[in-house]
Each structure stands twice: as structure tokens, then as C-alpha cells.
Curated annotation (Swiss-Prot):
Belongs to the HesB/IscA family. InterPro entries: Fe-S_cluster_asmbl/transfer, FeS_biogenesis, FeS_cluster_insertion, FeS_cluster_insertion_CS, HesB-like_dom_sf. It holds the Pfam family Fe-S_biosyn. Transmembrane segments: none annotated. It comes from Bradyrhizobium diazoefficiens (strain JCM 10833 / BCRC 13528 / IAM 13628 / NBRC 14792 / USDA 110). NCBIfam families: iron-sulfur cluster assembly accessory protein. GO terms for biological process: iron-sulfur cluster assembly. This is Uncharacterized protein blr1755. PANTHER family: IRON-SULFUR CLUSTER ASSEMBLY 1 HOMOLOG, MITOCHONDRIAL, IRON-SULFUR CLUSTER ASSEMBLY PROTEIN. GO terms for cellular component: cytoplasm; cytosol.
Length: 106
């Protein structure tokens, strides 16, 4: 389904531990928008919704809704530290096109 690199898991666990809200895991989803039709969204979530798939990545729970599941199948999420720009990257084998920003696909 979805894979997270060690770097991504560590960055997310760090964000969750410094968050003031209760966190049951990470929600990963897509929504219409961006340059190429879809954009990625991630956020801390309290708990999974009834139709979510729950994936365990090294102790981190990842929640994926049924609408996003097919589009995200096989995606690897990484966290890259770079002097100019640090952040999450998505390597999605289902994307026919990708925006240069890396946050949108079609």
C-alpha cells in the first residue's frame, strides 16, 4: 500500500511528539487540486475513520481513506533535509504526470 522511509517515519514521530493534540496516527490522502489534478495531503489524526485502511510503519499508524487508496497504492513517502528546501517527497508509481513542486500529480 504506502511505504514510509525511516527518515519520514522519524520526522512524523517527531512532529507528533511535539504536537499538543492527541494523535493516533498520520492521515495521508489525496484531493482534487494542484497543477495536475490531484494533490497530496497529510496531517495528524486522532483515530482512523470506519472506511480507512490502517498501515503500521515502524510503530506509526498511517490512515488512508477508501477514495485515496487506489491513487496512493505503492507510493513511498520520504523526508528530505536539504539546505534550500526540506520536506516530504512522494514517489507515486500511479502518477502519469508530476508537478515540479512534487506536491501535485495527474
Amino acid at each position: 500500500m504506502i511505504n514510509l522511509t525511516d527518515s519520514a517515519v522519524n520526522a512524523i514521530k517527531s512532529a507528533i511528539s511535539s504536537s499538543e493534540r492527541r494523535a493516533g496516527g498520520l492521515r495521508v490522502m489525496i484531493e482534487a487540486g494542484g497543477c495536475n489534478g490531484f494533490k497530496y495531503k497529510m496531517g495528524i489524526a486522532d483515530e482512523p475513520k470506519p472506511d480507512d485502511t490502517v498501515i503500521d510503519c515502524d510503530g506509526l499508524k498511517v490512515f488512508v481513506d477508501s477514495k485515496s487508496r487506489e491513487h496512493l497504492a505503492g507510493t513511498t513517502i520520504d523526508f528530505v533535509l536539504a539546505p534550500e528546501s526540506s520536506g516530504f517527497t512522494f514517489h507515486n508509481p500511479n502518477a502519469a504526470t508530476n508537478c515540479s513542486c512534487g506536491k501535485s500529480f495527474g
